[in-house]
A protein has these predicted regions:
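Single conserved hydrophobic/aromatic residue that forms the stacking wall/gate
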Residues: 1-9, 13
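Conserved SGNH/GDSL esterase-like catalytic core that processes O-acyl groups on lipids
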Residues: 9, 18-19
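Short, small-residue-rich loop/turn micro-motifs
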Residues: 13-15, 22, 190, 222
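Proline-centered helix-kink/hinge sites
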Residues: 14, 56, 102, 222, ...
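Gly/Ser/Thr-rich beta-alpha loop segments that engage phosphate groups in nucleotides
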Residues: 14, 24, 114, 242-244
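Class I S-adenosyl-L-methionine
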Residues: 19-185, 189
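C-terminal target-recognition/interaction regions appended to catalytic cores
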Residues: 150-262
């Protein structure tokens, strides 16, 4: 049975840059090159291989914004060329999760349609990027365990660290958020000290980190989503490596709408 659609995330630009040296050599010898030559040894090779073998009618890939500038733009050039070589028409856009959750999280969305089916005539449109509708205070629990409050030692360290880099003209430091604003991007390393997103507290208490449940809300997961079967460390990692659920849902709905219209 034909694979109707393929959805994937994190093709991982932490892979080594795609090499074009071998491709150039083959071309100089008059030999054919293909996506396997350009992407061999990268995670994207697996994605391209699945698409090549199963020919889904459409696919939807998500990755970090820096994919477009990685390796001076060569990485995205190879990815785009590879997908077009496989005869897919592409639509791509950098979108910010803050349209759906109180978090600044820019990601590139890549949607492709099989040219043999849609002939490049699909009327796909990305969902409108709305103004932020939620603030950090909307995801916070009123009663939070004391273990999420920073110790005096850690709080002093973070302040001294930030001051040291501020004196050098660097921008490194903790992220003490405004309750009426949005947060920085949640990363998988949040479990280490929580410094990228700190919540101010009253009564002279040190700031606190988000709980795993609050992190899940920051990614758009409903409270019915279970987190109690893993440790806090693993929950933080999973949330930091995840996607903004309502954003992915909105793009997916547009993809399905386009497929049904053709």
């Amino acid at each position: 049975e034909m694979l109707r659609s393929l959805v994937g995330s994190e093709m991982c630009i932490r892979d080594r840059p795609f090499s074009i040296a071998g491709v150039s050599k083959k071309k100089s010898l008059g030999r054919e090159t293909g996506f396997k030559d350009k992407t061999q040894g990268t995670l994207f090779f697996d994605v391209a291989d699945i698409i090549s073998r199963h020919r889904p009618k459409a696919f939807f890939l998500e990755n970090v914004k820096n994919l477009m500038s990685h390796d001076k733009g060569n990485t995205f050039k190879v990815i785009k060329g590879t997908l077009e070589e496989l005869r897919y028409s592409l639509h791509y856009l950098v979108m910010d999760g803050q349209s759906y959750v109180p978090q600044h999280r820019e990601r590139i969305m890549i949607v492709g349609f099989d040219c043999d089916i849609f002939h490049g005539e699909e009327q796909f449109v990305f969902p409108e990027q709305k103004q932020k509708t939620k603030s950090i205070k909307d995801i916070l629990d009123p009663n939070i365990e004391e273990k999420y409050t920073l110790s005096d030692k850690l709080w002093n360290y973070l302040q001294n660290y930030a001051e040291k880099h501020r004196a050098k003209g660097n921008g490194f430091g903790f992220g003490l958020v405004s309750l009426d604003g949005i947060s920085r991007t949640l990363s998988a390393r949040y479990y280490k000290d929580g410094s990228e997103i700190l919540i101010p507290q009253s009564d002279g208490k040190n700031p606190r980190r988000l709980s795993p449940r609050e992190c899940a809300r920051l990614m758009g997961y409903p409270d019915e989503y279970r987190l109690n079967q893993v440790s806090d460390v693993q929950a933080y990692r999973q949330c930091g490596n995840s996607v903004v659920v309502p954003l992915i849902t909105a793009v997916s709905e547009q993809l399905i709408k386009t497929m049904l219209a053709n």
